[in-house]
Amino acid sequence: MEKTQDRDTLSGRMEAEGSLNSEELPPHPQSPPPPPSPRSPTSPVTPELPQPNAPTEVEARQLLVEEWGPLSGKLELPPRISWQLLFLERPLYRNLLSSPNPEGINIYQPAPPTGPTRKPLKELGNFRGWYITTQNLQGPLSWTVKEQCVNLLAKKLWEELLDDEQPDITIMDWFEDSRLDQCVYELHVWLLAADRRTVIAQHHVAPRTNGRGPPGRWIQVSHVFRQYGPGVRFVYFQHKAKNRMEPGGLRRTRVTDSSVSVQLRE
């Protein structure tokens, strides 16, 4: 299931956006791009603060049930996973991406005006966890490509849950209607097996804006992976935002509030 809508639509002003069709989708790659290279730490590790008393196993389960809602009778934890661990790590119903809003932009307001800049993107916010590259296009245009590879087992999800229950994996993103080109944004997501090469499911979309509404509004793109099959261990998230080179520097399309989350099926 996929959805593309702007912020005004979510606020109640139901202005219809142009629907996406197969002609708007970029070609499906034969295989996902290589995973990002490990990043060197840029600062010393901060000592951990003392933690408050953790809930008991029974208390942790009750708190999570209150938070998640009624659980399926089939949901059983393997011996290596405890309710206390799930309460601490919160692998479900939260954003698994690092730095989802690197520039601190509020989607409930129009994108703040900004001119061209010669500063590197990494100097414009906190992009920890993102692997960033540039893809040059014809003329003054280019893509800024940002990627993350989410290790679901490292986030304390477990094989039996992913293979047997196959919880929903929800992707959401917001991009600025920058009007730099007809298509200023692309989203590519792959669900990968343990080898990080075998593709189990994928989603690709390149929405075109219709030119209506004020420039700088935020447009939402979303997709839910359901019943994707067993073996998923990684979510490879990639989005592209278009830039245009001008005399004063690079004018960018901004992206914010990117998310990858996992939910139990209802």
UniProtKB/Swiss-Prot annotation:
The modification Phosphoserine is found at S31, S37, S40, S43. Strongly expressed in kidney. Weakly expressed in stomach, colon, duodenum and prostate. Its main location: cytoplasm. SMART domains: FBA. Residues 27-41 have a biased composition (Pro residues). It holds the Pfam family FBA. Residues 86-264 form the FBA domain. The keyword Cytoplasm applies. One of its GO terms (cellular component) is cytoplasm. Residues 1-53 are annotated as: Disordered. Keywords: Cytoplasm, Phosphoprotein. Gene3D superfamilies: Galactose-binding domain-like. Residues 1-16 have a biased composition (Basic and acidic residues). PROSITE patterns: FBA. It is found in: Cytoplasm. The modification Phosphothreonine is found at T46. Promotes cell proliferation. This is F-box only protein 50. The gene is Nccrp1.
